[in-house]
Amino acid sequence: MAFLGHLVLGKVMAEECPLSAPLVLKDMQSGVAGETGNVWTIAPDCSFTVARQVGLNLLQPHKQGQLTLQQRLQLEQMMDRMAATALPEQLGSGPQVNARRITLAYGGKQSVLTLPPGGGDLGALRAAASDDSTRHMLDLANDLKAMMGGG
């Protein structure tokens, strides 16, 4: 009987979302119209949205859903990696004209990776990254985008 209770408890714990606050990933490109790009958000109930942002306006989500059990477990592993490797607030090159910025925000903390304009595929950027924090940030961004679907 105790074993059955442990199985049920394990199932309930696995189904819970590992977030206590929204997790937000932004991939933005600066330009004439301000910053434009995509915003991926996972809520504490593990529902998610993907929306375009143009300037200061966040448009209606063009994709939304609920993370699967496997995705929740993957998210829990990502959160453990984030906790183990504190990302600095600023990564990458300094201010640039028309920079690309990847921002990861959770629980009142935010890390911003500044890249040259355009930037390209996150995998290629990761391969060219010169430090572990930048590679870690690009890994997290790539994994989150894959989990919720591209932009």
Predicted regions and their residues:
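Short, internal acidic amphipathic alpha-helical interface segments
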Residues: 67-101
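Bacterial N-terminal signal peptides
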Residues: 1-7
